[in-house]
Regions:
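Short, Lys/Arg-rich, polar N-terminal cytosolic tail immediately upstream
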Residues: 1-9
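Alpha-helical transmembrane segments in multi-pass membrane proteins
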Residues: 17-72, 86-96, 114-118, 122-131, ...
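Aromatic-anchored segments of alpha-helical transmembrane domains
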Residues: 22-29, 98-106, 170-179, 221-232
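Functionally important transmembrane alpha-helices
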Residues: 29, 188-247
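Transmembrane alpha-helix boundary signature
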Residues: 71-77, 101-116
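Residue-level signature of the transmembrane alpha-helical core
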Residues: 129, 133, 137, 167-171, ...
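Membrane-interface helix/loop boundary segments of multi-pass membrane proteins
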Residues: 138-168, 208-212
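C-terminal membrane module of polytopic membrane proteins
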Residues: 221-287
């Protein structure tokens, strides 16, 4: 059934996948809270002490959605697909890799924690890195492994098709972050949605060019670590919802910085690689 839905109604399939993912995260968060506070209060301590541990558990629940969709549609092999390989794929994604590495360095060395902030216990720092990895794994499995790949198969590997798939998958990636309206200020969430839509286009372009999902999981994890590193290492710093609420219109400049390399990655001379990595027969247009 899922295979037929994906083949015959790909846009409905993608929208449904995103909606199911968000619903699973929301319901999972509520059920986990009820379980910890109602049925197993003895286990609630670590989750109350470290928000990132709770976030990791919720992301693990959300991860079940793309895994189930990939399994039922016979496409769990996306995790094993080598494509261009991890290192060569990272070269394709060198722009965000360098950008994020610099961002991480600046946040660690120049921004730093508030004065007097205490370093968290090792298990809490480990929970932070686990949460960042699970966010990257769950969202990339959904938005690239399920959504972006489905859209590419639908629109095809010609220039117009690749750009349509890239734009729609980016828009869905941005829309998926609207769920933060439940805990953050609307203006900050709107700006986040715009920026992540542009980032989603960049990640889709890298995925189409490399055919390797783990490159995107790595970059996504690095992105979240760079943005939240001080919150992960120190007490008394901003939570995820507070960080999102602090977003202002000046951050829209980063959306442009994410979009510019998309034009380079999807230039005409490189589109044959997209068809090659994905086993699509339709030859792209000449540059």
């Amino acid at each position: 059934m899922l295979k037929r839905l994906r083949a015959n109604h790909p846009l409905v399939y993608c929208l449904g996948a995103v909606a199911l993912f968000l619903a699973a995260m929301f319901v999972g968060s509520l059920l986990l809270t009820l379980l910890l506070l109602g049925l197993a209060p003895w286990a609630a301590g670590p989750f109350l002490a470290e928000d990132f541990l709770f976030q990791a558990a919720v992301e693990a629940i959300g991860l079940a959605v793309p895994l189930a969709l990939l399994w039922r549609s016979g496409r769990l092999g996306v995790f094993a697909r080598r494509g261009a390989g991890f290192l060569d794929g990272l070269l394709v994604g060198v722009y965000p890799f360098v950008w994020l590495s610099l961002s991480l360095s600046v946040n660690l060395a120049l921004v730093g924690p508030p004065e007097g902030a205490a370093v968290k216990a090792p298990w809490r720092i480990a929970a932070f890195f686990l949460a960042m990895f699970l966010i990257g794994l769950a969202e990339e499995a959904l938005f690239r492994g399920v959504v972006a790949e489905t859209l590419l198969a639908h629109f095809g590997p010609r220039r117009a098709g690749v750009w349509k798939a890239c734009a729609v998958s980016g828009a869905l990636f941005g829309l998926g972050h609207a769920v933060n309206l439940m805990s953050s200020e609307p203006v900050g969430v709107l700006i986040q949605c715009c920026v992540t839509a542009a980032l989603g286009m960049l990640y889709a372009a890298i995925y189409y060019r490399t055919g390797n999902l783990w490159v995107l999981i790595f970059l996504h994890t690095l992105q979240d670590v760079a943005a939240l590193i001080n919150s992960g290492l120190y007490d008394g710093t901003a939570t995820i919802s507070e960080v999102v609420s602090s977003f202002d219109p000046s951050m829209l400049l980063s959306a442009l910085l994410y979009l510019l390399p998309v034009f380079y990655l999807l230039r005409g001379s490189r589109l044959p690689l997209v068809a090659a990595f994905w086993g699509l027969d339709d030859a792209p247009e000449a540059a």
